[in-house]
Amino acid sequence: VLDIYEQKLGQTRVLDIYEQK
């Protein structure tokens, strides 16, 4: 569960940075 949660957070962060840029 932690793995999936971390993966989801990482993906969201990447998308956030991509959108910001």
From Swiss-Prot:
Chemical reaction(s) catalysed: RX + glutathione = an S-substituted glutathione + a halide anion + H(+)
Entry coiled-coil feature ranges: none
UniProt key word Cytoplasm: no
GO molecular-function term, one example from the UniProt record: glutathione transferase activity
Protein name in the entry: Glutathione S-transferase 1
EC number(s) recorded for this UniProt protein: 2.5.1.18
Superkingdom in the source lineage: Eukaryota
Homology family: Belongs to the GST superfamily. Phi family.
Keyword annotations: Transferase
Function statement: Conjugation of reduced glutathione to a wide number of exogenous and endogenous hydrophobic electrophiles. In plants, may have a detoxification role against certain herbicides.
